[in-house]
Structure formats: structure tokens, C-alpha cells
Amino acid sequence: MLMKQKGIIIKSVDYGESDKIITILNENGAKVPLMVKRAKKSKTGLQANTQLFVHGLFIYAKLRGLGILNSIDVINQNYQLRLDIYDSSFAALCAEIIDKSMEDEEISNFNFKLLEFCLNRIKEKDSAQLMSIIVLLKKMPSFGFSIDFDKCSISEENDQSKLIAFSFKYHGVISEQYIDRDPHAINISNKTLYLMDILQKLPIDNMNHLNIHQNILNEMSDLLIMLYREYSGIFFKSQKLINQLKRLEAK
């Protein structure tokens, strides 16, 4: 039986010499894994159309478990997302976070909306790094943890202006009054914590174009990646390339 699904490719893995397995996130928010025969043979026309971020109508034979791709009617190649290595890397991180946050049979329309929001904003030249930060903030509960960025984890006071660090000992942000209780607390600027709280709580439908200083973006990213490693044991493969790019830039 032939099935039709509109969706965006969020994962692509080579399989053997000429095939690949892709995963699409369909418009209902379900993951659909598909085998693509002869995908790496240029004459098939599937090489370009089975890359990350391609949005299309996927027509496939439904088998037990893995579907077999028959053809793709491309809606948007999202080619511009692959032109800049930084944009591409952070867009891949967004897709990977959403992919890993979902069980195989899970359906979440929010996940598709979140992915589409991030890819569209990157194409509109919003910071790709900021988009990955938004996804990391929004998807925390799916990985089994949550952080309040608006109150001290020791006193539970909500005076945002006094928050200056994150403590793994106390599993949250702490105010300047209690900084001596954890000598290993990570200093985080108050503005960074304030903006993380805003981005975590603000619905994506209400987010206008955002412009945040690069130093603050870096501080957010570094903290969030540490949180995910500490509380969920996950390190995202896409982050490895981002780290390599940072090291090259620093030389």
C-alpha cells in the first residue's frame, strides 16, 4: 500500500554502499523512518532530495516497521540552510534535539511547529544559535528535567536581579547572597539568566525577531549543553561539529 506524508527530514543515515535511511517528522508531529534505495546514486535524483531539512510530500510503501520510499514531491529544498556551515550545524542540532526527545510512536504537533519555526527563522537570518537555544529550553521536560531560571534554588526567592550563578550542587540558579555555599558554582550573568527565563516561558507564536549579544548566546549554549549532559546524560552529535568550528575560529 502506498502512503503519502508531508514532512521535513530530520535525520539521514547511510546504509550500505548506495542506500540510506531517512527519518521525516510529519506535519502531525510523528516520526516516519524510510528506507531510500539507491539514494547515493546521482542518476536517481534522490541524492539532493533526501538531505536534512528537505520539506516535501513523501510517497512510500508501508511495510512492517520501515517504509520504502517511492518518490518525493519537494515543497521546499531549504537549500539556503546548507549554504552556511554555522547555520547548517545549529539547524542540525535543532533537528537532533527534537528527534531524540521523541519516542518512536510519539505524536506531537508542537514538535513539528517548533522545528518549522526554527528553520524558517534561520532562513530569515535570525541567529541559528539562538534557535538551538530555544529548542534546548523548550525540550527539557522531554529529557526528564526542568530548571527554574527566575528564582534562587536555595532561598526560593523570586528576585531575578540577584541571580548570578548556576549550582549543580543545588540543582538550580543561586543568588549572590548564597554564592559562598557552592565554591564550584558556575558564574552566569544576570542578563543571561533573565533572557533564558523569558525564552523558556514565551510561546514561540509570540516570539518576534530577536537580537541577543553573541557573548550571551555563548553563555546560554554552554550552560544548556552542560545541563543536558548532567541531567540526561546526552551529548548531541551535532554539537561536536559546532565545538570544532569554535576551536578553529579561536586559532
UniProtKB/Swiss-Prot annotation:
Keywords: DNA damage, DNA recombination, DNA repair. GO terms for biological process: DNA recombination; double-strand break repair. SUPFAM superfamilies: ArfGap/RecO-like zinc finger (SSF57863), Nucleic acid-binding proteins (SSF50249). It comes from the Bacteria. GO terms for cellular component: bacterial nucleoid. Pfam families: RecO_C, RecO_N. NCBIfam families: reco. Involved in DNA repair and RecF pathway recombination. Belongs to the RecO family. This is DNA repair protein RecO.
